[in-house]
């Protein structure tokens, strides 16, 4: 009896055959990979060999490209210079041959003023605001308006600031002991009109009230110069004043069916409310 059965021999030979086929497949794949690597390396070497040949024409065209770029930059610079020169020529032509209106030019200049002949004050206008910018703007506007009304102006003169402070509790309950401070600063300017007609001054103040600027308050003190016969002039103007006040005074008065005023007063004084006998400590003690 042999040690190895034919069945076992067939199994062993079958496994050996399987191993042989696997090794052959591995060898074939490794050979294919080597061939692809060799092909890639060959292509890379060909590309490297062809690089100097392809770069030679680019080297020859670089100076031409530089010259073209320089020409384009020169053209753009000349075009920009020409446009600047054109606009400069236009502006100089406008400044020489044309001018802006006087009202527009005055915005960029100091306000014009009239000279006072006698220097008698007629009106003191005080401007107040919490913003210096708004105050300066409206003061400049008032001075320009006075010039066109032929009113001599002096100012604006800065007056002392009004500083007000308040202290309040921050809130109730938890923050009751902590306090909060508030401060308000009022800025003032004084504009004085001299040697002006009273009607012109009234027109100036009405114009300022009509075109008042936000955040700016006004207070005016006006002086009017009258002659010695002021009583006669007041008597002459009295009927006109009565006519002007008649619609306002007609709203006040007493009813026709009401009791006379004398009777009302006597009844009130004779009432029990004012009697002294009913009051405490009114009786005199007998000695």
UniProtKB/Swiss-Prot annotation:
Top-level taxonomic group: Eukaryota
SUPFAM superfamilies membership: Ribosomal protein S10
Region (Disordered): 33-84
One Gene Ontology MF term: structural constituent of ribosome
One BP annotation, GO: translation
Cleavable signal peptide: none
Main subcellular localisation: mitochondrion
Record-stated family: Belongs to the universal ribosomal protein uS10 family.
Name of the protein in its database record: Small ribosomal subunit protein uS10m
